Every structure is written in structure tokens, then in C-alpha cells.
Amino acid sequence: MHCPFCSAHDTKVIDSRLVAEGDQVRRRRECQACGERFTTFETAELVMPRVIKQDGSRQPFDEDKLRAGMQRALEKRPVSVERLEAAIGRIKHELRATGEREVKSRVLGELVMAELRKLDEVAYIRFASVYRRFQDLNEFREEIERLSREPSKP
């Protein structure tokens, strides 16, 4: 790393510590040329995969769009913002854990449905009705029956 004071390229790390709950490394460095000390911070670059839509188009993962869809399903339901944010974090973690550069929107939709089912069954049905394009009352009934037959995964 080059020195911000004299632009020399020969710097030495004299101390490293984890900060931000282990998500960042703070390093104290010393320039070998001028002797000045400075601090750097290191974080992992977490790149989210692109989303392949049903029509084949590709777009960047949009956390705001994910949050808005889940909030719409959870509207007027007794689920805290903290629980919603934790669910979003788990979805993002699952997407990154695939190791893929691109993921089909269907995979993302199924992850959202699984998280909503854990949060609130009414929100799950709301989301499923739009996501799976329910056409009539029977489709709602079938999904509710399936929901009551299959235990929710923690």
C-alpha cells in the first residue's frame, strides 16, 4: 500500500485488529520511507449475483425491491423490522452461498417464500398468491391446505 503522505510504496503493518463485529480489519501502518503512520480499514467485497428474470433478461440484485415486496406481504402483520431485516440477511447469505454469478428469479422467489413462511403464514399466503399467480379461490385453498399439512422449517 502506498503512503498517503509521501506516496512511497514500502509500508509496514504494525498492528491489525478486528472491528465492526468482525466484519472489518483495522490496520495501523508505518511508511518505511518517511516514518509516518496511518490507519487503513479492510472489508470483504460481497458481490450479489445478477437475477435472471423469466423473460431471460438479467438485472442486478436489488435489495430495496426485495424489501419492498416482503414489506407489502407483511403489511399490517405483527412482524418487527428486526425480524424482516434478519430474513433479508438470510436470503442474501443464501444467494451468495450459491457461489453463482447469476441466479434465476424463481430461486429468489422460493427463498422469499420460505422466509415469509417462517415469519408469518398470512404474509406467506399473500406473497404466494401474487408470486404463483393464483387465479381463483381453489388455488388459495390448496395452498392453505398444503401449508397446514407441511410443518414450517425453522
Swiss-Prot record:
Cofactor binding description: Binds 1 zinc ion.
GO BP annotation list: negative regulation of DNA-templated transcription
Zn finger residue spans: unnamed: 3-34
Cofactor: Zn(2+)
Entry keyword set: ATP-binding, DNA-binding, Metal-binding, Nucleotide-binding, Repressor, Transcription, Transcription regulation, Zinc, Zinc-finger
Domain ATP-cone: 49-139
GO MF entry, a single one: ATP binding
Function: Negatively regulates transcription of bacterial ribonucleotide reductase nrd genes and operons by binding to NrdR-boxes.
Similarity comment text for this entry: Belongs to the NrdR family.
HAMAP family, alphabetized: NrdR
Protein name as it appears in the record: Transcriptional repressor NrdR
Organism encoding this protein: Azotobacter vinelandii (strain DJ / ATCC BAA-1303)
UniProt lineage: Bacteria, Pseudomonadati, Pseudomonadota, Gammaproteobacteria, Pseudomonadales
